[in-house]
Every structure is written in C-alpha cells, then in structure tokens.
C-alpha cells in the first residue's frame, strides 16, 4: 500500500531481458501519474532496473528504450548460442545505446536522485552510487550494475578505480524495507507493482531482497531473464507492466490526480458505513477510467507501440524466406562445428583490439587478485597445520623417548640431515626412520656377535711333565721329612663365551 507521506521512493528490481516489463510500468506512471515520478525523492535500480531508473530520471524516450530492448533480444536470438555467442557483446550494446540517448547533462539530473545498486568485487558488499561527475561515469555505473560475471565477461569493469559487478548479486531491490518505497518487479510476489498470478501456492522465495512466489509462471520468467523470449512474449510483458501499473494507481487512489496530498478532501468525522461507501465509490470511479485490454497498446508511447507491432511481423523478403526453409536450416546446423570456431576467432580478435587500452590496468588487477588468492591459500594451510601438529607432536616425541634403543656409533643422523627439510619434519617419515634404525641395530648385532665356546678340558691347567727324578735313598733324612708329594691340579673355570664386536 502506497503511504500518504510527503516523500517516497521508487525501486526497480534487476531482471535481465525482462526489463521490457518496466517500460510498460514507466509509461503508465508517466501518463497517468506524472507527479509520482517527478516528485520522487530517489529512484533506485539494479541491473536492468538501473537502466529504467536512469531513463525516468534523465527523461529518455521510453519508446526508444523499449524498441532497443526488443532489438537486442532479437539479435541475441539470431545466434546459435544466443547471448552466449562470442560475437554478442552485451556490455558494448548497453554502452553505445546510453551514449546515444542520454543528454550531455544527464549526470547533473541524476546526481543525488538516482541510485544504482552495485556489488563490490573486493568484499562482495553492496554499494549504491548516487553521485556522478560526468556522463561517462553515469554510463559506466549502469554498465557495472548490469555486468554478470562469466555471462558478460571475465574481467569486471571499474568505476572510480574500484571493480564492481551486477548489483542484483548483493541487493536486487534497493531500499525495499522502507514503507515509503514503491517496489517494482516482473516476478509475482509481494512487490507493490508486479504480476498477479492466480496461484494457490503461498510459499515464496526471497532472493537478495526480491520476493518471488513459487509457481510455474515465475519459473518461466526466471528462465527467460538471461535468455530472451520471442518478440510476442516481450510484447505481452510490456502490456502486463502497463496493466499492473494501472492496477497500482487505482488501488491507491492515484489515478489521474495531480498530487495525492492536494487531491485528498479535508478530513471529517464520519461513521463506518460512510467510510465503506466512500471507498466503494472511489473504486468504481477508478475502474471506470481504466482502459480496456484491447486498447492498452493505444496508450503506450508511439515509438514503443510501433516497435512492438514490428516485432510481431515476420519479414517476407526473399532472403528470410530462403533462410527459414528446412533444407537451409539443416545445412546451417550441420555447418556450425566449422563456422563457430571461425566466428569465435574473429570475435576474439575484435575484443582483443578493443581491450588494448585497458590492458595495463587489467593486468595489474589480475596480478593483485592472484597474489591475494595465493596468500589466502597459504594462510589457510598454515592454520590447518598449526591446528593439527601441536596436538600430535608431544605424543610422538614421548614415544620416541620411551622406545629408543641405546645409541650406536652408526646412527641415522647423517641420513636425516641429508634429506630435505620438509621430509625431516614429516612425522610419518620420522617414524619410518626410527623403525629402520631399530632394524639396523638388530642386523648389526646379529652379524658381528661371535660365540667362542671351548670345551672344559681345553681350559683345564696341568703341570708340565718333568723328567723322572732319580730314586731317592729311602734312608736319606730329606725323604723321611717330606712325605708323599700331592698331585698338582687346577680346577677348570667355567666356559664363558667371549664376545667380540668389531667396532662395538
């Protein structure tokens, strides 16, 4: 419901090729409620909505704008891949059209009143640009607001040294939350001016502040936002926008009134019955002023009406007739694998030549972005490693301290020092080296240990055999004092293995 306040805003949602719907809405507002556009404090827009808002603020002919919408959609449909064909340059088409139709002082009319929704590439935040220093800045703001990544190109355009992309990514319907903002959208939902689909589904999807009801018609509209429909469908969308604009004006009592604040009668106390009768009479009066369905095209601008009628007429020249024949169409389809690379190469060459003036700035930006991405990846990897290594390293050190064997002269320190640093710091490799060191010790001990065991008889010590002494005289006094001589024998020591380890 439109609030009866002193100030109000108008906001147009982004919708791609469905922007022809806004041409019908804007034509209705200019014709039946010009004060609503002239006295609006701000007019906002995103993507295709920004083009419509710019046209309303600067006074561009809506008929020419609608004709351009249909012309661009027809050019896109001529190609095999539609708007994705390399020869179709949407950014170039928008810039050339705005250069042609915008007046030289358009930035003066737009500054402070026009708001264009943009998405900043560096942080993804939404930015609303409302001050423009020149006509070129106004055109560049519209180009940035309609630049869809990958769909329109890979390198985003810049405005005042900052890179921006489509404003619908971050905020597709600026200032929708304010009560004094008239929201316009080609998708049925909760916007003030939008199609009224007869659907029983109460569920809705809110995409970047845009209310979209779940139904088949909205799904069809979403599919045609980036891939334009047929001219007949565009004509019906323009008529639908005109009808929805009339419905909004009638519902809020703004139809054919110079100013809603001046046209309202003075307030006076009255009962509930009088209030109901007044509302019914106002509705009946407004409904009587609505044009019929068959005469809607008569109320559109003459240039737009002519463009819509021409779009529905099939050309009858000889070349078009031949190209529409089935054999010619089959031959054209079969030649696509051969003609498409040639067309792509030609289009790439033309775009490269047009890109040459901006090459230094774009290369510098790509270098900065590549460095930022690499730095982010390195910092993220460091955080992950720092989170896992401190928890595992103390346990690993403690296990090595407990399970280590006595050091030997032949250790693995030399081998570890010979390895790269990243291999020495790897825990799994350290475990493998420790196990290899243990196996090496066992092999060395088994190789150089010798069990030298001698029989006990070999270690028994015996006295050397002396020559037999001369028989002594038993009668001598020495023989009588000495007595019998005992046997000389030494007990054999226990046999012990002699361990000899070379170098151990």
Swiss-Prot record:
Record GO cellular component, one term: endoplasmic reticulum membrane
Q: Which domain of life is it from?
A: Eukaryota
Entry's pH dependence statement: Optimum pH is 7.5 with (1,2-dilinoleoyl)-phosphatidylcholine as substrate.
| Pfam families, per the entry | Patatin
Sites carrying sugar chains? 39
Q: Which residues form the active site?
A: 47, 166
Q: Using the record's annotations, give every residue carrying the modification Phosphoserine.
A: 372, 404, 428
Where does the record place the PNPLA domain? Answer: 10-179
User: Crosslink site(s) for Glycyl lysine isopeptide (Lys-Gly) (interchain with G-Cter in ubiquitin)?
Assistant: 92
Question: Where on this chain is GXSXG (motif)?
Answer: 45-49
Q: Which residues lie on this side of the membrane: Extracellular?
A: 30-42, 159-329
Spell out the subcellular localization from the entry: Lipid droplet; Cell membrane; Cytoplasm
Residue interval(s) of motif GXGXXG: 14-19
Q: What is its main location?
A: other
The record's region (Disordered) falls at 463-492
Q: List the disulfide bonds.
A: none
Family matches, as Gene3D superfamilies: Cytosolic phospholipase A2 catalytic domain
Q: What is the effect of changing residue 92 to R?
A: Abolished ubiquitination by PEX2
Q: Which disease is it linked to?
A: Genetic variations in PNPLA2 may be associated with risk of diabetes mellitus type 2.
Known role: Catalyzes the initial step in triglyceride hydrolysis in adipocyte and non-adipocyte lipid droplets. Exhibits a strong preference for the hydrolysis of long-chain fatty acid esters at the sn-2 position of the glycerol backbone and acts coordinately with LIPE/HLS and DGAT2 within the lipolytic cascade. Also possesses acylglycerol transacylase and phospholipase A2 activities. Transfers fatty acid from triglyceride to retinol, hydrolyzes retinylesters, and generates 1,3-diacylglycerol from triglycerides. Regulates adiposome size and may be involved in the degradation of adiposomes.
Protein's name according to its UniProt entry: Patatin-like phospholipase domain-containing protein 2
Organism ancestry: Eukaryota, Metazoa, Chordata, Craniata, Vertebrata
């Amino acid at each position: 419901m439109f609030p009866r306040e002193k100030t109000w805003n108008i906001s147009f949602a982004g919708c791609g090729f469905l922007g022809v719907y806004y041409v019908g809405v804007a034509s209705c507002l200019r014709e039946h409620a010009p004060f609503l556009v002239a006295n609006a404090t701000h007019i906002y827009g995103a993507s295709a909505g920004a083009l419509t808002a710019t046209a309303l603020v600067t006074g561009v002919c809506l008929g020419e704008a609608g004709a351009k919408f249909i012309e661009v959609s027809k050019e896109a449909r001529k190609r095999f891949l539609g708007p994705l064909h390399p020869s179709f340059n949407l950014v170039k088409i928008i810039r050339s059209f705005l250069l042609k139709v915008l007046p030289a002082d358009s930035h003066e009319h737009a500054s402070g009143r026009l708001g264009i929704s943009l998405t900043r590439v560096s942080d993804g935040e939404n930015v609303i640009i409302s001050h423009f220093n020149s006509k070129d800045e106004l055109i560049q703001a519209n180009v940035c607001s309609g630049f869809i990544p990958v769909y329109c190109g890979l390198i985003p355009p810049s405005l005042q040294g900052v890179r921006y992309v489509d404003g619908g990514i971050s905020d597709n319907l600026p200032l929708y939350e304010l009560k004094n903002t008239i929201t316009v959208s080609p998708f049925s939902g909760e916007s003030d001016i939008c199609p009224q689909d007869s659907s029983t589904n109460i569920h809705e999807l809110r995409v970047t502040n845009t209310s979209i009801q779940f139904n088949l018609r909205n799904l069809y509209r979403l599919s045609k936002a980036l891939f334009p429909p047929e001219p007949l469908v565009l004509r019906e969308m323009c008529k639908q926008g005109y009808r929805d604009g009339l419905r909004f004006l009638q519902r809020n009592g703004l139809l054919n009134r110079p100013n809603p604040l001046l046209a309202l009668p003075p307030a006076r106390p009255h009962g509930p019955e009088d209030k109901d009768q007044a509302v019914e009479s106002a509705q009946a009066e407004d409904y009587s002023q609505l044009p019929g369905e068959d005469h809607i095209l008569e109320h559109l601008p003459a240039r737009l009406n002519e463009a819509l009628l021409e779009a529905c007429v099939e050309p009858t020249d000889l070349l078009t007739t031949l190209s529409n024949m089935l054999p010619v169409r089959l031959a054209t389809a079969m030649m696509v694998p051969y003609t498409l690379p040639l067309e792509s190469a030609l289009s790439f060459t033309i775009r490269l030549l047009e890109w040459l003036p901006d090459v230094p700035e774009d290369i510098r930006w790509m270098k900065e972005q590549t460095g930022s991405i690499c730095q982010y990846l390195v910092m993220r990897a460091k955080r992950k490693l720092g989170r896992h290594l401190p928890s595992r390293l103390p346990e690993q050190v403690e296990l090595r301290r407990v399970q280590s064997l006595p050091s030997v002269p032949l250790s693995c320190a030399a081998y570890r020092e010979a390895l790269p640093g990243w291999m020495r710091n790897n825990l799994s490799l350290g475990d493998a080296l420790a196990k290899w060191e243990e196996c090496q010790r066992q092999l060395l001990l088994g190789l150089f240990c010798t069990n030298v065991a001698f029989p006990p008889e070999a270690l028994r010590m015996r006295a050397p055999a002396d020559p037999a002494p001369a028989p002594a005289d038993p009668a001598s006094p020495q023989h009588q004092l000495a007595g019998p001589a005992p046997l000389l024998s030494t007990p054999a020591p226990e046999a012990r293995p002699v361990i000899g380890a070379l170098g151990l």
